[in-house]
Regions:
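Acidic catalytic/metal-coordinating carboxylates
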Residues: 53-56, 79-82
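Active-site residues of response regulator receiver
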Residues: 72, 100
Length: 234
């Protein structure tokens, strides 16, 4: 468990003009380092701690007392949405910004419904993260333009996930397995990607087929590929 923090165990008393404290949670050290370099250059912001997975993040959260969290959606073990839901049980109003590699709007919808205050793509983090952090610290919701446009288009056309009840019925982990199937990943590769056992992945696949009324693994793959294509071109 790799965690770092820069705080005392007692919550710091806010001072006039004090820098806003940010906890970065990402399983890639280079991403954490890059965000820290970017954030620590700002006169009003400072990274107070880092973690690479959910358990470590909760430990640092308890000791570092951040003003905002930046969380990667695709953490090893419990993912970013699982961590977000856990955080909301103890810190219902703490601002959380989700970083994601997924540009499918369903992930943004689920993150916001789970209590996220913002959602941006990792590839635009350098450009958008400072704006996003300041927006959510001011009480706003921030979603990157690309994702916002997709969500609006889905809402207007009625093709969005809110009206696609079968896909919407999938759990967060089932959706992740479904997406990886659509990208051509086999069961063993999915298990490795998500740090799950093959038996667990097979169980998720069975649940997905049941929820989507699919009779075979072939139908599951075809449906997943089609869904991925639709989301990418939306």
């Amino acid at each position: 468990m790799n965690v770092t923090h820069k705080s005392q165990s007692r919550a710091p008393q806010p001072q006039p003009g004090a820098k806003k404290r940010i906890l970065v949670v990402d399983d890639h050290p280079i991403v954490r380092q890059g965000l820290a370099l970017l954030i620590n250059r700002e006169p009003d912001l400072v990274v107070c701690g880092e973690a690479e997975e959910a358990t470590g993040a909760m430990h640092v959260l308890a000791s570092a007392h951040p003003d905002v969290l930046i969380v990667d959606i695709s953490l090893n073990g419990p993912d970013g949405l699982d961590l977000l839901k856990t955080i909301r049980t103890t810190h219902p109003v703490l601002p959380v910004l989700i970083l994601s590699m997924h540009d499918e709007s369903i992930y943004a919808e689920r993150a916001l419904r789970a209590g996220a205050n913002g959602y941006i793509m990792k590839q635009e983090a350098t450009e958008k993260v400072l704006v996003a952090v300041r927006r959510i610290l001011s009480g706003e919701i921030y979603v990157s333009d690309r994702i916002a446009n997709k969500m609006l288009k889905h809402y207007i056309t009625g093709s969005g996930t809110l009206r696609n009840s079968s896909i919407a019925d999938l759990s967060d982990r089932e959706l992740e397995v479904f997406r990886l199937i659509g990208e051509g990943h086999g069961t063993r590769q999915i298990a490795e990607d998500l740090h799950l056992s093959i038996k667990t992945v097979e169980s998720y696949q069975a649940h997905i087929k049941e929820k989507l009324s699919l009779r075979s693994s072939r139908e599951l793959m075809q449906r997943a590929i089609q869904w991925n294509m639709n989301e990418k071109t939306a």
